[in-house]
UniProtKB/Swiss-Prot annotation:
GO biological processes: translation
Organism: Aeromonas salmonicida (strain A449)
Pfam families for this protein: Ribosomal_L29
Source taxonomy: Bacteria, Pseudomonadati, Pseudomonadota, Gammaproteobacteria, Aeromonadales
Name of the protein in its database record: Large ribosomal subunit protein uL29
Annotated GO CC locations: cytosolic large ribosomal subunit
Signal peptide: none
GO molecular-function terms, A-Z: structural constituent of ribosome
Keyword Coiled coil listed: no
Gene3D superfamilies, A to Z: 1.10.287.310
Record keywords, A-Z: Ribonucleoprotein, Ribosomal protein
PANTHER family per record: 60S RIBOSOMAL PROTEIN L35/50S RIBOSOMAL PROTEIN L29, LARGE RIBOSOMAL SUBUNIT PROTEIN UL29C
Family: Belongs to the universal ribosomal protein uL29 family.
Amino acid sequence: MKAQDLRQKSVDELNQELLGLLREQFNMRMQASTGQLAQTHTLKQVRRDVARIKTVLTEKAGA
């Protein structure tokens, strides 16, 4: 997910995507703690995607 693509979305779309990613991150954390998560690198990707969305939301709020 690129920040440039995120900037084209509306605030409502970004909030929905953020909520979905946070749920996904929670589920991944639970899987990682029980040893069921095979691809641990996805945790890092989701965390960075959340940060990108939050950054774009902050940019839109300031504009």
